[in-house]
Amino acid sequence: MTEPGRYKKTVNLPKTKFDMRANAVKREPELQKFWADHQIYENLSQNNPGDVFVLHDGPPYANGDLHIGHALNKILKDTINKFQLLQGRKVRYVPGWDCHGLPIELKVLQNIQPENRAKLTPLKLRWKARDFALKTVEKQSKSFQRYGVWGNWENPYLTLKPEYEAAQIGVFGKMALKGYIYRGFKPVYWSPSSQTALAEAELEYPEGHTSRSIYVTFKVTGLSETAQPLLDEYLPTLKVAIWTTTPWTIPGNLAVSLNPDLTYAVVKAGEDYLIVAEDLVETLTETLESSFKVIKTLPGKALENSTYQHPLFEREGPLVLGDYVTTESGTGLVHTAPGHGQEDYQVGQQYGLAMLSPVDGDGTFTDEAGPFAGLNVLNGGNEAVIEALQSAGALLKEESYAHKYPYDWRTKKPVILRATEQWFASVDGFREAVLDAIATVNWIPAQGENRITSMVSERSDWCISRQRNWGVPIPVFYNDATGEPLLNEATVNHIQGIVAEKGSDAWWELDNDELLPEPYRSDGNTYRKGTDTMDVWFDSGSSWAAVCDQREPLKYPAEMYLEGSDQHRGWFQSSILTSVATNGHAPYKTVLTHGFVLDEQGRKMSKSIGNVVDPAIVIAGGKNQKQDPPYGADVLRLWVSSVDYASDVPLGKNILKQMADVYRKIRNTSRFLLGNLHDFDPAQDAVAYEDLPQLDRYMLHRITEVFTDVTEAFESFQFFRFFQTVQNFCVVDLSNFYLDIAKDRLYISEPNAQRRRSCQTVLAIALENLARAIAPVLSHMAEDIWQSLPYETEHQSVFASGWMRLEDQWHNPDLASHWIVLREIRQEVNKVLEQARTEKEIGSSLEAKVLLYVSDTDLRQQLDAMNPSTGGGSNNVDELRYLFLASQVELLETPKNLDRLMYQFQSETLGVGVVTADGKKCDRCWNYSTYVGRSKQHPLLCDRCEPIIENLVTQGQISLTEEGRYQPNTK
């Protein structure tokens, strides 16, 4: 029978239950259920042989839905944790949530009718806030788990839990007993919209803020001993000029600051003489549109203790010295209001100035502001002060000034600096110890160390009190008679015990007799409990104590903290401040920071632009699934591994499509490997290393190189290197090279042939190690591969199988250098084959005969050995025709005959030509052979396939049907 197709069922085609399509929306939850049902994470975290590894979770805020930044953060953490698990360490990951604070309180209040808010007691508000936070935690927890993130989701840490609150009060108490906590009347960032003090980490600086800046003169009324002989003649009309961007603070002005080391000039301005910094005379001439003439100069320190008249109030103020005064802007003299600025306050303390802060909690001028009382400082107050200065003849100029100005991060409204009674952590008391601790930490990227060092070096004392109800109370009482705070070891320990048992609601539920320890219930004094709560950064900054140090199986210091780069001024800082203050060391050994997620054009994501990427839609798809297809969690995880997280990272629809393409390539490669192992059992069929052909040993060398690189990528947290290496391995090394060549021996050989089993040996090694390598990132795909292995393994899950297993003997650089040359030749051959294919000279490369010339004699001998003319002495693998996927290869002694060919390439060292193959096409392997047609029994077969068919018939594996076709015998 000579009809084509009679042998097509005699080839070994791939078989696997591993789908080509991921169907992630259905399959990923099934795999997550498998992990949960078999407690894979729990067993490994308890029973792995290595030491304990704790990546301590920075708590997201329990408010609203998760955004793409949450996904980036949690997936990075999970990638590290899973790598450590595969390395054999006992990974203990406890996810956490930040549950107190103003944003949740505001959410609760927004959901209550205005008329009912007045009836809301602090306790009822707290109950509603707790309920809101817990519901949000539950919702966010499900989302995080859908990302494939492993951890102790059954028992996360919540800052509202009694045991956490008690540990936090313990940290506060230790700091207080060491003298690091004090109460002071100082300027703090104050949010009129929230009516509470804010920490620096609760501020944001939006683009586009414009202030009304003013240049103002104050009339000099008295000169210091040093200045008098120099300036006395100008005194009747001598004035100091100041510049400010906060006109509303002028009623709080008590001094004017100069830099002692700057030179100041007296300039003639019309009828007046003005004192300004000499370096700014030229700039001010232009700004104030006035021709200033320098009359005299003198050092700033000469003006100390001179006096001036406030232009709006019947009081004089001194000229004082401050190193912070510069010539970067303004006049070189700074209007100083100790109640409205940190540096102003410090100068005020130095010179014994009063603390004047004539503004109340909602940002309204008090009676101390005289005619401005009742005006809101940021609205009518600014305008009124400017008009009053104009009327007093003290206003030189007003202009708009665009600059960075602090806003409340939650209400998105401007804040002010306002002196109030607050509780502070005295950072000065332990600043040097914190700086020393920072130097012991491994910061990734390295510039993080400079960033946090600079912030801690320059920061002021930490205002830790808040005037809100939803938080952990500051455990202090005040003496009714004296107002003195009662805060000592006995009171803190007593309250800590109550909170541990009943939670912080007890502060509002219990009366003083229950909250005070025994001696203070009857000491002749009466006390009232404080109403302030702690800054939420103190909440989360105590997590090392409440979680790492308190939970038995964890570790303190933790191995790692990992958050966004904004946490250098947030959680990283509050954590190291509290840890160093109480225990003298950092709470972490390594700190890794990542950037923010931007769109593909590098813009911030915002609903108004419409460029927001919602992780839930990435995973499950949007309403329009053509527009927003369901990619599943692994594609999202793959994106996280692909970016250089050290800076801001882009994401959008095009990038997601690219990630999905890479995902599919890895999946299709894995599917090919699985499909061609369907009849392979490593225990019985694996070929020993010394018996492998050169090509297979070269691939094991490449596997060693590739997976060593992958290991180094994970160890150095450079996940983008993992992404590039694995993608390149799957596409370039496997699909385009090894697997392309392997198809012939996998499909055409007898099932148990050495050339096939040796290839399957390499496929199994590649597949198992690929599954392990991708498991930290493509967790679902890796598990899907492992569960689809067609042979038994001793490990229930890919994660239980440990990290990649590479044998020393596989490393063979000498062999690799030979095969690198062969691959380069193959590339050139492929280019000529492609040219012939494009111009329809050939269809498949098997229709071609390759003519090859090399100038190097040694290489020529090596190629001769790979090109047996009769098949004798060959292992039927390491042959040029298989390498090039051509039916024949002819080695030329000289390149001169190549010139006559239509399809050819020549260089100084290499010549390639392509012509049509000799003979006819074999119906089974599709190679061309002059043998086809010679056999009476099998005229359609080549001399390679004929004996294979005869052997398969003899072994009873195939038989001839009545229709004259060969088919496998069913067992």
UniProtKB/Swiss-Prot annotation:
Signal peptide boundaries: none
Keywords in alphabetical order: Aminoacyl-tRNA synthetase, ATP-binding, Cytoplasm, Ligase, Metal-binding, Nucleotide-binding, Protein biosynthesis, Zinc
Family matches, as InterPro entries: aa-tRNA-synth_I_CS (IPR001412), aa-tRNA-synth_Ia (IPR002300), Anticodon_Ile_BEm (IPR033708), Ile-tRNA-ligase (IPR002301), Ile-tRNA-ligase_type1 (IPR023585), Ile-tRNA_ligase (IPR050081), M/V/L/I-tRNA-synth_anticd-bd (IPR013155), Rossmann-like_a/b/a_fold (IPR014729)
Motif ('HIGH' region): 60-70
BP GO annotations: isoleucyl-tRNA aminoacylation
Disulfide topology: none
Listed EC numbers: 6.1.1.5
Catalytic activity: tRNA(Ile) + L-isoleucine + ATP = L-isoleucyl-tRNA(Ile) + AMP + diphosphate
Entries under PROSITE patterns matching the protein: AA_TRNA_LIGASE_I (PS00178)
Matching CDD domains: Anticodon_Ia_Ile_BEm, IleRS_core
Cofactors required: Zn(2+)
Cofactor annotation remark: Binds 1 zinc ion per subunit.
Enzyme class: ligase
UniProt xrefs under PANTHER family: ISOLEUCINE--TRNA LIGASE, MITOCHONDRIAL, SOLEUCYL-TRNA SYNTHETASE
NCBIfam families in alphabetical order: ileS
Protein known as: Isoleucine--tRNA ligase
Species this chain originates from: Acaryochloris marina (strain MBIC 11017)
Gene from which this protein is expressed: ileS
